[in-house]
Amino acid sequence: MDPNMMIVKTLSETDCSHDNKLILPRDKVENIVRSTGVPVPRMGIQVEILDNTNSYWVNLRQSQRGYFIGRGWGELRDARNLKAGDVIKLYWQNTKFIFSM
């Protein structure tokens, strides 16, 4: 696995709130964008997150502060019963993120 394609994140209270947003590290997302050549328009891009055999479609968006996953994040968060302090990994492979803990 290429570590440049991996996002490791300790979930914050904000990530687990009912705002349904997962804030992502800007440098990691920009590295993936550069490596893949797939731009992230301001209104976002649909991205698949594969969690074992479950697939979640989420909206990866850019804001003035960085990047976040919006629509779809709440479903994955609730399905995995994620809470603040949990460490998650998102590995970009081909055209999707592979989720792990």
Swiss-Prot record:
<dbReference type="GO" id="GO:0005634">
    <property type="term" value="C:nucleus"/>
</dbReference>
<dbReference type="InterPro" id="IPR015300">
    <property type="entry name" value="DNA-bd_pseudobarrel_sf"/>
</dbReference>
<dbReference type="InterPro" id="IPR051442">
    <property type="entry name" value="B3_domain"/>
</dbReference>
<keyword id="KW-0805">Transcription regulation</keyword>
<keyword id="KW-0539">Nucleus</keyword>
<protein>
    <recommendedName>
        <fullName>B3 domain-containing protein At1g08985</fullName>
    </recommendedName>
</protein>
<feature type="DNA-binding region" description="TF-B3">
    <location>
        <begin position="7"/>
        <end position="101"/>
    </location>
</feature>
<keyword id="KW-0238">DNA-binding</keyword>
<dbReference type="GO" id="GO:0003677">
    <property type="term" value="F:DNA binding"/>
</dbReference>
<dbReference type="InterPro" id="IPR003340">
    <property type="entry name" value="B3_DNA-bd"/>
</dbReference>
<dbReference type="Pfam" id="PF02362">
    <property type="entry name" value="B3"/>
</dbReference>
<keyword id="KW-0804">Transcription</keyword>
